[in-house]
Amino acid sequence: MDVTSQARGVGLEMYPGTAQPAAPNTTSPELNLSHPLLGTALANGTGELSEHQQYVIGLFLSCLYTIFLFPIGFVGNILILVVNISFREKMTIPDLYFINLAVADLILVADSLIEVFNLHERYYDIAVLCTFMSLFLQVNMYSSVFFLTWMSFDRYIALARAMRCSLFRTKHHARLSCGLIWMASVSATLVPFTAVHLQHTDEACFCFADVREVQWLEVTLGFIVPFAIIGLCYSLIVRVLVRAHRHRGLRPRRQKALRMILAVVLVFFVCWLPENVFISVHLLQRTQPGAAPCKQSFRHAHPLTGHIVNLAAFSNSCLNPLIYSFLGETFRDKLRLYIEQKTNLPALNRFCHAALKAVIPDSTEQSDVRFSSAV
């Protein structure tokens, strides 16, 4: 039953003698402006929107994403890779993690171009393309969240166990950790895919994205468990900072070192939360008995909502390089030196130096650079 119609019916019964209104016009502006917002939040409200209206809204959001976020994500992640590789002799342990994170984000940003033009979720109609896109997205999604989780743990080790972690926090161990994270991301995707594919070999319309067991794994392993670990790490870090309150000379430097990682994690949480809520709502709904397998896809039932949450998830990969550039003091210094080496225009060099320094005052202070590189 329509929530809006039910509410109006209750209101009329409270006032006897009120004439019954005419049948509601499903194309009235009032319904179309108010109801979709509620429906999008509940992943259940695009029923009153016509196909044309859903297309217009999706096209508008896709244009905003393509104009404002996609260039930042594509150029920014490439810039992170180029600058850090150019200064590989000065590469720190956090730089290794951010390079791998930039690789995963760059792949997701490139993949987002398909989603931007997939306004009707049409590629979910093709089983092979649907499965390929789901595998491609999950591998890089897992790698992003796993890298963020490991970076939070590494940050806690660097701050809380600074004197005892010199043997553990080495570049060799960092490279080994990156390799294991990529292997874990691929395994978390391919192992469930192999298992469920053997069970659905006879289904012509089988898509990896529609398997409920895979969706439960994505929500738990790709969102709930990692952020529980991240929350624990940051709670321990806060306790360390509180204990170091009397060391006023170290506290500002440590807060600057934490600001970048904390911002990246918060942006990831905000961007990926709608996607996981959308999937969770679908998982909590009971499957209709006798429904055709191809028609049970929640993205078929709610294409506009699925499009919105996908764009929100892709936005994380676009915002990560922006946060990294603005809050990473070591990276800004490398970027300034890279521009000076590659250009012979003194005016441009002075402008870039002033712009990078204006982001956070005293960002080029040598003591802060040494501290940021150390952690």
From Swiss-Prot:
Transmembrane regions: 63-84, 97-120, 133-153, 176-194, 221-236, 260-280, 307-327
Statement: the UniProt record of this protein carries the keyword Electron transport: no
Chain positions carrying an annotated carbohydrate: 25, 32, 44
UniProt membrane topology term: Multi-pass membrane protein
GO cellular component annotations of the record: axon; axon terminus; cytoplasm; cytoplasmic vesicle membrane; cytosol; dendrite; dendritic shaft; dendritic spine head
Topological region Cytoplasmic: 85-96, 154-175, 237-259, 328-375
Expression triggers: Up-regulated by EGF and TGF-alpha in endometrial, ovarian and breast tumor cells. Up-regulated by progestin and by phorbol 12-myristate 13-acetate (PMA) in breast cancer cell lines.
GO molecular function, one term: G protein-coupled receptor activity
A biological process term (GO) from this entry: nuclear fragmentation involved in apoptotic nuclear change
InterPro entries (UniProt xref): GPCR_Rhodpsn, GPCR_Rhodpsn_7TM, GPER1-like
Modification type N-acetylmethionine: residues: 1
Expression across tissues: Expressed in placenta, endothelial and epithelial cells, non laboring and laboring term myometrium, fibroblasts and cancer-associated fibroblasts (CAF), prostate cancer cells and invasive adenocarcinoma (at protein level). Ubiquitously expressed, but is most abundant in placenta. In brain regions, expressed as a 2.8 kb transcript in basal forebrain, frontal cortex, thalamus, hippocampus, caudate and putamen.
Keywords: Acetylation, Apoptosis, Cell cycle, Cell membrane, Cell projection, Cytoplasm, Cytoplasmic vesicle, Cytoskeleton, Differentiation, Disulfide bond, Endoplasmic reticulum, Endosome, G-protein coupled receptor, Glycoprotein, Golgi apparatus, Immunity, Inflammatory response, Innate immunity, Membrane, Mitochondrion, Neurogenesis, Nucleus, Postsynaptic cell membrane, Receptor, Synapse, Transducer, Transmembrane, Transmembrane helix, Ubl conjugation
PTM info: Ubiquitinated; ubiquitination occurs at the plasma membrane and leads to proteasome-mediated degradation. Glycosylated.
Extracellular-side segments: 1-62, 121-132, 195-220, 281-306
Disulfide feature: 130-207
Short name of any one Pfam family annotated for the protein: 7tm_1
Keyword Glycosyltransferase part of the UniProt annotation: no
Subcellular location: Nucleus; Cytoplasm; Cytoplasm, Perinuclear region; Cytoplasm, Cytoskeleton
Function: G-protein coupled estrogen receptor that binds to 17-beta-estradiol (E2) with high affinity, leading to rapid and transient activation of numerous intracellular signaling pathways. Stimulates cAMP production, calcium mobilization and tyrosine kinase Src inducing the release of heparin-bound epidermal growth factor (HB-EGF) and subsequent transactivation of the epidermal growth factor receptor (EGFR), activating downstream signaling pathways such as PI3K/Akt and ERK/MAPK.
Family: Belongs to the G-protein coupled receptor 1 family.
Subunit structure: Homodimer. Heterodimer; heterodimerizes with other G-protein-coupled receptor (GPCRs) like CRHR1, HTR1A and PAQR8. Interacts (via C-terminus tail motif) with DLG4 (via N-terminus tandem pair of PDZ domains); the interaction is direct and induces the increase of GPER1 protein levels residing at the plasma membrane surface in a estradiol-independent manner. Interacts with RAMP3; the interaction confers proper subcellular localization and function in cardioprotection. Interacts with KRT7 and KRT8.
Note in the entry: Does not bind estradiol according to PubMed:18566127 and PubMed:16645038.
PANTHER family: G-PROTEIN COUPLED ESTROGEN RECEPTOR 1, G-PROTEIN COUPLED RECEPTOR 182 AND ESTROGEN RECEPTOR 1
Name used for this protein in its record: G-protein coupled estrogen receptor 1
Organism: Homo sapiens
